[in-house]
Amino acid sequence: MRIFENYHKVYLYIEPLVDGEPDEQKRYHISNLLCFLEKYLNITTNQYIRVKQNYKTLFKLKDNKKELHHKMNIMFGDIHFMLISMEKAYSLSIRMLEILGRPDTANMIRSSESYKIVKFFRNNLEHMNDKLTVEDYKYRESWYSNEYHSHWFARQWESMHGNAIKLGPYSFEIDESSFEFLWDLYDQIFKIITDEYIIPNKVNVDLAFKGHTPSQW
């Protein structure tokens, strides 16, 4: 798993040196978005690590139902927040690409299967109060549904098959490969920022903040 720590090394090269520059607002937007994109990517990584650690302990608790239930509650809480953080990282990436003048890439993300899966999970978790109280046969499964009862959300959430969790028509693999598309987007965004802001501004910023600039970027 990856940790992202570029923001504090490069924000001086992104933000304007003086007030009143024509692209001042845009540059502050990019700086702020990069800061929070890294925060949510790192939250996602931290939650993933917690999930994997807790998952390994479940098999040792098969004879201790109370502790097993407790650990599963913690694990699915971490999965919940991991998915919310992933969706936030996607949304921040889309906004950054729009501001950086890459609307086609932003639209590609919106239509990608990776984003659709995470967004579906996040939307259903956010609106679980509706999902838990409305009969819905759209995603019924033979192993829990009958003609009188089909609370699909309640039956599917907090169940896993191997590394996969299923919700409605989508499955999410709790594996590093599920994060690679999001990481690649970050790398694309950071390259754009490097080419268009960091490299062109580095000499002037280093002169203006001599002795106070980040040691490396």
Regions found by a protein language model. Give the residues of each.
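Amphipathic alpha-helical interface segments
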Residues: M1-S114, N146-W217
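Histidine-centered, metal-coordinating catalytic motifs and their short helical/loop contexts
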Residues: S112-Y137
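Aromatic- and Lys/Arg-enriched surface recognition patch
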Residues: T133-S150
